[in-house]
Amino acid sequence: MIVWQALFVVYCLFTTSIHGLFQDFNPFANKNISLKFPSLNRWEKNVMATGQQTIINSDSIYEWTPILSNITAGKKDSFVFTIDAEASGYGFAPTYEVLMFISGNICQMPMNRSDVDLTIYYSFNETVLENPNIGQSAVFQDGYIQALAISPVQSSSSNATSTYSNLYVVAELVNSTTEQPLSSSDASENWEYRLSISENDLVFQWDVRPWVEVLDTDMNSALLSTGNVTADAKVYHNYSIYDPSLYDLYVYSYEDSVQLNQNYNLSLCAVKNGPYLVSSQNTSNATVTSNSTNPLERTDLAIQKKITEYGGSVTEMFYVTGLNASTTYVAYLTKKISNGDGLSSVGGILFSHVYFTTRSTDVCSLIFGLDFCSDVAYSVPTSSFSVGNKTLMAQTYDHIAEALYANFSKALQLISCDADKDARYSPVMTCDDCAEAYRDWVCAVSIPRCTTTSSQYYIHRDKSHNRNDYLNKFIKPLDDYYEILPCIDMCYTLVRNCPSDFQFSCPNDLTTEDLLYQSYNFYMDTDYSTCNYIGNSSLMVIHPLDDT
C-alpha cells in the first residue's frame, strides 16, 4: 500500500491525465488501498422511465453510505455520482485528476451459479445507462469488486473543475461466457449486493494477509492475536490510545466456511451477515478491562478481546470460549476504516481467514494474562489440583516461575548497573535487559507448553516425570503429554544480555547434542510451532528445516 501511494504521488507530478491508460488497466487489483480524506459527495439514484430500470432508493445517498440492493435477471440498477473536484483529496487531486474509487460486496447469491456474473459498468457518458457496453466494466469476483474511474480536471485562475460532472454506473447480471444480459425468465433468483463510490478511498477492502495468528487451543477454547497494532494508535505526546473496537473476529464452523469461501471469499458483507457461530462484535462484555471478571473462567460461546503487549509489540487478543472438542473452526478478522471523521460503521477491511482445531481431551489447558510471566499465552499441562479452574492453575504456574526468579533478582542487584558506561559489564546491554531475558527464560522452562500431538520436535513427558520437580510436586499433570520445548534463542539472548559473572552458557549440537535436544529446540519455518518462544519475537532466528 505504501509503495502504491508513493508511485501515485510521483505519477501525479509527471502526467496530466491517465484516463486513457485506465481503459485497459486496473491498478487496484489485489491491492489494499487506504487514502483517507473526508468528502461530502453523494450518490443520486437515476430514475428512468424504461421498464427495465430498478429504483433502489429515490433519495440521495451520501458518501460512506453504500447502496444495498437486490437484483434479479433482466433488471438493471443505475446510479449517478456527482463529481466535486474541490472536495477530492484535500486539494491534491484538483491539479491533476479526480479519482473515483468503486468498491462493493456480494452479500448473498444463489448457490452453484458460476455461469452468472454480477457486472458493473461505469462511464462519464450518460448513454451508458441505455447501452452499458460503451463503458468500462468490472466483475464481482469471490464476492468483491474494485475499480477506478478518473476524470481530468480543468484549471483556471479562480478554481478547478472536473471535466465531467457525473459518473454513471449500471449493475446487471450477465452470462459469464457470452457476457450477455440474462433474460427476465430467470428472475426467480435474487442477488444481494452493496456498492459504494468515493472520491477518497475504497469503502470495501480486502487484505491477502491473515493478520491474525492462532496462538494455541485447548479442548474448548482458543486464543488468537492480531499483528502489531501500534500504527493504529492515536498518539498524544508520551502516551498512545488504542481502540479495541477497531478489529473484530467472526468464527464459523468449517462446514459453513466451505460454502462461504466458494462464493464470497473476499466479501466483508457476507462474512458479517453470514451464519457465523460467534463474533466479538455481538458478544456481550466482549472487551476485557481491568475490572472484568477473569476471562479464563468464561465457558459460554463467546469472544473476549483485549489490547495487550505480547511478543515485543502491541496486539489485540481474542479469546474464544464455549467451543466443542476435536472440532475445526475458521476465523475471519475484519477492520474498520476511517471516513475522515472517525471510524466508519460501514465498509472496512476483510483479511484472509485462518483455521484452528480444538483438542480432544483436557490434558492441556490454555492460560494467559499471568502477572509475572505476562507473555505466557499457550496451553500448559492441566494440573490435577485445579481441574476446571484455569485461574488457579495460571496463578500456580506464575508463582513457581516468580519464586525461581527471586534468587537471581537478588544476585543481579550486586552488579554495578548504575555505573558509568565504561564501568558497566556492557556498553550496549543493561541490567534491565538481563532481567527481562532471565524472566522470559525462566518462564519458558518452568511453564512447559503442552500439546497432544506427536512430532519429532516434541518430547513425550510422563505425567510423573516432568521437566523439573516443581511440576511434579505443585502441578501433578493430569495425564501424559508432549512438551513443545523452549527455543534455544532464549538461551542465546540470556547469555548475550547478562554479565559474564553469572557464567551462563547454552548447549550446542556439537559437544552437547543430547542435552540440547532434551532441553531446547530450534525455530523452524513450518506451519506449526517447533519450539516455544517467550519475549521479543524479532530476536528469533529461523533455522533451516531438519529433514532427519
UniProtKB/Swiss-Prot annotation:
GO cellular component: endoplasmic reticulum; plasma membrane
Disrupted-gene phenotype: Growth defect during calcium starvation and in the presence of lithium.
Keyword Manganese applies: no
Annotated consequence of substituting residue 498 to A: Non-functional
Annotated InterPro entries: MID1/Yam8
Effect of residue 434 to A: Non-functional
Changes after translation: N-glycosylated.
Signal peptide boundaries: 1-20
Membrane topology of the entry: Single-pass type I membrane protein
Extracellular side: 21-341
Residues with attached carbohydrate: 32, 70, 112, 125, 159, 175, 228, 238, 265, 282, 285, 291, 324
GO BP: any one term: calcium ion import across plasma membrane
Keyword Lipoprotein attributed: no
Location(s) in or outside the cell: Cell membrane
Topological domains, Cytoplasmic: 359-548
Keywords, sorted A to Z: Calcium, Calcium channel, Calcium transport, Cell membrane, Disulfide bond, Glycoprotein, Ion channel, Ion transport, Membrane, Signal, Transmembrane, Transmembrane helix, Transport
Gene Ontology molecular-function annotations: calcium channel activity; stretch-activated, monoatomic cation-selective, calcium channel activity
Residues spanning the membrane: 342-358
Outcome of substituting residue 417 to A: Non-functional
Note: Present with 3210 molecules/cell in log phase SD medium.
Physiological role: Calcium-permeable, cation-selective stretch-activated channel (SAC) that functions together with CCH1 to mediate calcium entry into cells. Required during mating. Together with CCH1, essential for tolerance to iron stress, which leads to an increased oxidative poise, and to cold stress.
Subunit structure: Forms an oligomer with a molecular mass of 200 kDa by disulfide bonds. Interacts with CCH1 to form a Ca(2+) influx channel.
Protein's name according to its UniProt entry: Stretch-activated cation channel MID1
Species per Swiss-Prot/TrEMBL record: Saccharomyces cerevisiae (strain ATCC 204508 / S288c)
Lineage: Eukaryota, Fungi, Dikarya, Ascomycota, Saccharomycotina
